[in-house]
Amino acid sequence: MGIKRQQSIQLVGMTEAHWADVSRIYAQGISTGLATFESEVPSRENFFESKIPELSLAALTPEGTVAGWAAATAVSHRPAYQGVVEHSVYVDQEYAGCGVGTRLLAELIALASRHGYWMVQSSIIADNDASRILHGRAGFREVGRRERIARATQGESAGQWLDTYLYELRL
């Protein structure tokens, strides 16, 4: 079933028309306490303002539902860092383990390279094994651990200090 699902997924540029599903999937990630330190889904306006349009993707099912999404933001507005982006990949729980995240990340990397970016990075909560494995398989390297960087607000770790790992891929 996973292979069939993966093959039937179409990657497209994310637009505001995808927001209902994107925000639903984002909320799933928030509730786990492992995907982000956000405590609530941002407004549609704030979400899209912060993302680089050419590095924003939605994975669509044949029915047009979003099965996952990936997006990148600028790390800094300083000219020296103009080629460095930080990204996120979120997959609907129903599609976890079906290759959706792998396809989204591979396409985001290809787009970043095509658009002249030279570094893609991600800060991953230490207990998010699935994301760490995904990034390792995609060629990212772990470059550092930030200990007790933030206190979890959601999930089983709520109230606890958590570590993150910084992963990067030079294009």
Annotate each PLM feature:
Residues Q6-I9, V84-E86:
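Short, solvent-exposed beta-strand edge segments and adjacent coil->beta transition regions
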Residues S8-V22:
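A short beta-loop-alpha structural element at the N-terminal edge
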Residues D21, E86, M119, A130:
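Amphipathic alpha-helical recognition patches that constitute DNA-binding helices
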Residues Y26:
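Hydrophobic "lid"/C-terminal helical patch
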Residues T32, E38-E94, L105-A106, E168-L171:
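Acetyl-CoA-dependent GNAT
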Residues A71, P79, Q121-I125, G136, ...:
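Conserved catalytic-core motifs of GNAT/GCN5-like acyltransferases
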Residues G97-A112, I133-R137:
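Conserved acetyl-CoA-binding loop-helix of GNAT-fold acetyltransferases
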Residues A112-I124:
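Conserved GNAT acetyl-CoA-binding A-motif
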